[in-house]
Amino acid sequence: MDSLTSILTPIHREGHRFAIIFAAVTIVLFLIWNPLGWIGVILTLWCLYFFRDPDRVTPTREGLVVSPADGIVNLITEASPPEELGLGDMVRTRVSIFMNVFNCHVNRAPVAGTVKRVAYRPGLFLNADLDKASDANERNSLLIERADGEQIVVVQIAGLVARRIVCDVREGHDLAAGERFGIIRFGSRLDVYLPVGAIPLVAVGQTAIAGETVLADSISVLPQV
């Protein structure tokens, strides 16, 4: 049953037109030459796989910050949030998750809260695995405020192949932890700026699963009584 469920996983709506195009081209290729058609079948299946949008089980305990993306934790550094959010120069711990073309590219909210600001900034399309991609590449930043007033920043960053950032939320939108808020095509990166003082619970090289992997526990930074 689990295997059947994985095969029948729905795709994100951003993939619908691509699936139609790939399928149409496949039909034409079959008409031209049968072996070419089978190549088209493989590419169509890859398209469906790329845009897959599986359900996730998100931990619900207060204070947890979950991964917004599937991929590999490739950087954990200290940095200031994007200047377009207007948060000043206060340094936070930044956890970067790199998505290759085989990862699920649907992005999910790292915490429950209200979107206070959405800021898009055009830029380059460097390899998203590079540290400087955070500053140089095209990006879309979200400032999310939890009910307790704590603010978390998540940044969608375009990559060498990714040329399309999709964000489905606007300022004032209330998000649940793990809720889908966007997607990036094809291969990219997400940065999460943790609450001040929060200690990351992941390590560089670790595999992260969107909406499930816990990046940090901000409650643990509160002073003990």
UniProtKB/Swiss-Prot annotation:
GO cellular component: plasma membrane
Molecular-function GO terms, alphabetical: phosphatidylserine decarboxylase activity
Site positions for Cleavage (non-hydrolytic): 187-188
Localization annotation: Cell membrane
Modifications the protein undergoes after translation, according to the UniProt entry: Is synthesized initially as an inactive proenzyme. Formation of the active enzyme involves a self-maturation process in which the active site pyruvoyl group is generated from an internal serine residue via an autocatalytic post-translational modification. Two non-identical subunits are generated from the proenzyme in this reaction, and the pyruvate is formed at the N-terminus of the alpha chain, which is derived from the carboxyl end of the proenzyme.
EC number: 4.1.1.65
Topology of the protein relative to the lipid bilayer: Peripheral membrane protein
Cofactor binding remark: Binds 1 pyruvoyl group covalently per subunit.
Cofactor(s), names only, from the UniProt record: pyruvate
Enzyme class: lyase
Keyword Cell membrane included in the entry's annotation: yes
Record key words, sorted: Cell membrane, Decarboxylase, Lipid biosynthesis, Lipid metabolism, Lyase, Membrane, Phospholipid biosynthesis, Phospholipid metabolism, Pyruvate, Zymogen
Protein's UniProt keywords contain RNA-binding: no
Catalytic reaction equation(s): a 1,2-diacyl-sn-glycero-3-phospho-L-serine + H(+) = a 1,2-diacyl-sn-glycero-3-phosphoethanolamine + CO2
Pathway: Phospholipid metabolism; phosphatidylethanolamine biosynthesis; phosphatidylethanolamine from CDP-diacylglycerol: step 2/2
Entry-linked InterPro entries: PS_Dcarbxylase, PSD-A
Modification type Pyruvic acid (Ser): residues: 188
Protein family according to the UniProt entry: Belongs to the phosphatidylserine decarboxylase family. PSD-A subfamily.
The protein's assembly and partners: Heterodimer of a large membrane-associated beta subunit and a small pyruvoyl-containing alpha subunit.
Function: Catalyzes the formation of phosphatidylethanolamine (PtdEtn) from phosphatidylserine (PtdSer).
Protein name as annotated: Phosphatidylserine decarboxylase proenzyme
Organism field: Parvibaculum lavamentivorans (strain DS-1 / DSM 13023 / NCIMB 13966)
Upper classification of the organism: Bacteria, Pseudomonadati, Pseudomonadota, Alphaproteobacteria, Hyphomicrobiales
